């Protein structure tokens, strides 16, 4: 046996996960959340797609990601059977709450009793409390990007693809690139955000644009406006099939204005907060 494997679901690949992944040669994870099979009614909205998770895990220095499909068949296997996925490694790193096998009976002590070298990595903390994917989802739901990003160790991001706009932003003097979000984000509040696209600062509205009346979006859309001296960002987006949008800061909640002039004044104020 050789090499170190880090085991866990790693949704978000937050600072706590990074402690587990540190120094690992491989990561053992699932493509889908166990709740999607065992308790679909309670399945959490994931912080990232599997492709994003794999990319971030590898950016931590992990060479190989072993991704299993979580199925009812796998869930019904005894923990002794699950050991087959770990037997080629000399050491296993995991969090204190990592479990595997039927009835979640497999854990670090189960492996140690069978001769495995297991290191249980202590939780990372933020503001005196354990960092978890659940806690990050809760922060995003409140629009608390400062806390969410601090726990992630990077800006939370989504993937989007361009959709046709209605020209209203341009008519107001604030042209936008309009994106449909490809991965289902947590319940991020509708509102105005400071974002980064290709490393360029921008301002974005996530929501329905209710002031537009009949021109409002039927489903939530991300409308992104760049400062006037960054036309290259528009070109970069136009050339991309998928665009990564990093959320840096929550500015305000979305609301319906009495008229376009009132909306235009508010957009000007929002832009000053982001760009000045």
Annotate each PLM feature:
Residues 19, 52, 147-154, 262-273:
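A non-catalytic, amphipathic alpha-helix used as a structural packing/dimerization or gating element
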Residues 27, 67, 120-122, 247:
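Structural signal for conserved beta-strand scaffold positions within catalytic alpha/beta enzyme cores
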Residues 36-119:
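N-terminal Rossmann-like or analogous alpha/beta NTP/dinucleotide-binding catalytic cores
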Residues 14, 57, 92, 148, ...:
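Residue-level signal for inorganic ion chemistry
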Residues 166-276:
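Phosphate/ribose-recognition catalytic cores of enzymes acting on nucleotide-derived substrates
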Residues 116-208:
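Glycine-rich, Lys/Arg-enriched anion-binding loops that position phosphate/diphosphate groups
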Residues 1-55:
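N-terminal catalytic cores of NTP/NDP-binding nucleotidyl/phosphoryl-transfer enzymes
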């Amino acid at each position: 046996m050789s090499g170190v494997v880090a085991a866990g679901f790693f949704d978000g690949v937050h600072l706590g996960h990074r402690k587990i992944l540190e120094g690992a040669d491989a990561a053992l994870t699932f493509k889908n959340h166990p709740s999607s099979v065992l308790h679909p009614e309670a399945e959490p909205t994931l912080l990232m797609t599997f492709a994003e998770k794999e990319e971030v895990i590898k950016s931590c220095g992990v060479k190989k990601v072993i991704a299993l499909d979580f199925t009812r068949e796998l869930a019904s296997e005894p923990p002794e059977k699950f050991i087959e996925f770990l037997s080629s490694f000399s050491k296993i790193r995991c969090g204190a709450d990592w479990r595997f096998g039927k009835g979640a009976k497999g854990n670090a002590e189960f492996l140690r009793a069978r001769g495995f070298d297991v290191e249980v990595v202590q939780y990372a903390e933020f503001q005196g409390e354990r960092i978890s994917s659940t806690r990050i989802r809760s922060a995003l739901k409140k629009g608390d990007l400062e806390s969410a990003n601090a726990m992630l160790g990077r800006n939370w991001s989504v993937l989007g693809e361009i959709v046709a706009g209605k020209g209203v932003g341009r008519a107001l003097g604030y042209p936008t690139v309009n994106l449909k979000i490809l991965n289902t984000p947590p319940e991020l509040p509708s509102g105005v955000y400071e974002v980064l696209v290709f490393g360029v600062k921008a301002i974005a509205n996530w929501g329905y644009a209710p002031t537009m009346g009949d021109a409002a979006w039927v489903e939530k859309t991300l409308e992104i406006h760049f400062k006037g001296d960054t036309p290259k960002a528009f070109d970069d987006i136009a050339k991309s099939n998928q665009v990564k949008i990093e959320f840096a800061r929550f500015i305000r909640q979305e609301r319906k204005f009495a008229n376009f002039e009132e909306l235009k004044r508010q957009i000007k104020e929002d832009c000053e907060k982001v760009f000045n």
